[in-house]
């Protein structure tokens, strides 16, 4: 994917040029206190969301998959209502809410399912549920 990461000592890091910060834990409970602190002190300036049960992401307030989808469509002849979106993490809420049709994966973070109870669940990532859904939708064999 070309994604690069760097582990840094935040006490020595200036923060300039940082697009996103990931906090990863073995146990999801280890992130709760950090999440509470970040939301209390930076919730008005940052998007704080889980991309996986054990991965907390922090980025600019105006950054989300929903914003990215809307930006992508700006110069194309499609609207958000024309889009289908699939999600499995809390960082998918905005995108799923904006798309014309959103689907939640069976293996999705329970917090995503709670945030989007109206969306249909389509199956597991490991079972290629997205590919199977699209193949059926478009008549591909």
Task: Give the ranges of each region predicted by the language model.
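Conserved acidic, metal-coordinating active-site core of Asp-based
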Residues: 1-86
């Amino acid at each position: 994917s070309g994604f690069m990461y760097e582990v840094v000592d935040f006490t020595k890091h200036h923060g300039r040029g940082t697009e996103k910060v990931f906090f990863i834990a073995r146990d999801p409970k280890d992130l709760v206190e950090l999440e509470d602190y970040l939301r209390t002190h930076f919730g008005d300036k940052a998007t704080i969301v889980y991309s996986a049960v054990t991965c907390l992401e922090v980025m600019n307030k105006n950054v989300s998959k929903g914003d990215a989808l809307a930006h992508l469509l700006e110069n194309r002849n499609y609207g958000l209502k024309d889009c289908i979106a699939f999600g499995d993490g809390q960082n998918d809420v905005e995108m799923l809410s904006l798309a014309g049709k959103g689907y939640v994966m069976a293996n999705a973070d329970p917090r995503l399912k709670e945030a989007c109870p109206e969306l249909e669940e389509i199956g597991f990532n490991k079972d290629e549920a997205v590919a199977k859904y699209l193949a059926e939708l478009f008549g591909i064999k």
